[in-house]
């Protein structure tokens, strides 16, 4: 519990010490943000209780993970072209005038707001305020116009695994450091980080987590996580750029973007 408390404190300090600036484009695609006078990235905890598997076979996936537990996939696809297209400069040039639909970052995401993609990136894409509620925080994820974004999505190579009777559907998103979606559940799928880092917290369907649906994941991490007994802790891990997390059907999960993050999920509906 002491380690969890230190993690939360470090996260809060790094997120909210000084003024945010966007670093020049590099290996982070121009998305990386920092704060003057602080470390360049949000601290992460080393704890990881989700298996990482490189070059997993379909047989192994079906036998050990598909209906049983999450797994982090490495080395299954090459999305270097898609990643290059997702740089800040390229996305603004290609889709800056497109109207995107933002959702509130709470469990039920009731509120929707439409505005130009460039306005979202330049004015709303900033680190999460720890005092803000999830239902007051706007977040670009999920509601994609597949016709308008098809020139981008056609270059994405999803993990090659499918479940019988399901059809894949993409959900593309970009969010600021410290943002995320609190605990919720839905059908199975994969979530790949293109730029940045995203921390996941997961519970099996039969174990409902303690959380407030309108509070942010950051608030949960600072207020509830440190007091959890070891037996009550979720499975958790930080997904790095180029990795994809598989989550089985109806698993509870919450996410926390440790950097400004670009990500895409493949839902198996």
UniProtKB/Swiss-Prot annotation:
GO cellular component: cytoplasm; endoplasmic reticulum; endoplasmic reticulum lumen; nucleus
Signal peptide as annotated in the record: 1-24
Chain ranges of the JmjC domain: 147-269
Keyword Repeat: no
Molecular function GO terms recorded: cis-regulatory region sequence-specific DNA binding
Pfam families given in the database record: Cupin_8 (PF13621)
Domain of life: Eukaryota
Cell compartment(s), UniProt: Endoplasmic reticulum lumen; Cytoplasm
Biological processes, Gene Ontology terms: positive regulation of canonical NF-kappaB signal transduction; positive regulation of sprouting angiogenesis; regulation of glycolytic process; regulation of pyruvate kinase activity
Alphabetical keyword list: Cytoplasm, Endoplasmic reticulum, Glycoprotein, Signal
Glycosylation sites: 135, 145, 214
PTM note: N-glycosylated.
InterPro entries, A to Z: Cupin_8 (IPR041667), JmjC_dom (IPR003347), JMJD6_ArgDemeth/LysHydrox (IPR050910)
Role according to the record: Functions as a positive regulator of TNF-induced NF-kappaB signaling. Regulates angiogenesis and cellular metabolism through interaction with PKM.
Quaternary structure annotation from Swiss-Prot or TrEMBL: Oligomer. Dimer. Interacts with PKM; regulates angiogenesis and metabolism.
Protein name: JmjC domain-containing protein 8
């Amino acid at each position: 519990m002491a380690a969890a408390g230190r993690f939360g404190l470090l996260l809060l300090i790094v997120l909210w010490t000084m003024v945010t600036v966007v670093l020049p484009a590099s290996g982070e695609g121009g998305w990386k943000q920092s704060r003057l006078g602080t470390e360049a990235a949000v601290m992460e905890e080393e704890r990881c209780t989700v298996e990482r598997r490189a070059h997993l076979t379909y047989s192994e996936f079906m036998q050990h993970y598909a209906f049983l537990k999450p797994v982090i996939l490495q080395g299954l696809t090459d999305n270097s072209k898609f990643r290059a297209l997702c740089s800040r400069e390229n996305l603004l040039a290609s889709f800056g005038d497109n109207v995107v639909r933002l959702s509130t970052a709470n469990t039920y995401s009731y509120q929707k707001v439409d505005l130009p993609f460039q306005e979202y990136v330049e004015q709303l894409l900033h680190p999460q305020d720890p005092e803000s509620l999830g239902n007051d925080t706007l977040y670009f994820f999920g509601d994609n116009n597949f016709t308008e974004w098809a020139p981008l999505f056609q270059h994405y190579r999803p993990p090659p695994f499918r479940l019988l009777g399901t059809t894949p559907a993409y959900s593309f998103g970009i969010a600021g450091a410290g943002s995320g979606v609190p605990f919720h559940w839905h059908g199975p799928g994969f979530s790949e980080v293109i730029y940045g880092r995203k921390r996941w917290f997961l519970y099996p369907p039969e174990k409902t987590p303690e959380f407030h649906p309108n509070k942010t994941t950051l608030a949960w991490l600072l207020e509830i996580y440190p007091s959890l007994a070891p037996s009550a802790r979720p499975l958790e891990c930080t997904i790095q750029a180029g990795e994809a997390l598989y989550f089985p059907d109806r698993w509870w999960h919450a996410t926390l973007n440790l950097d400004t993050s670009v990500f895409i999920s493949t839902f198996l509906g």
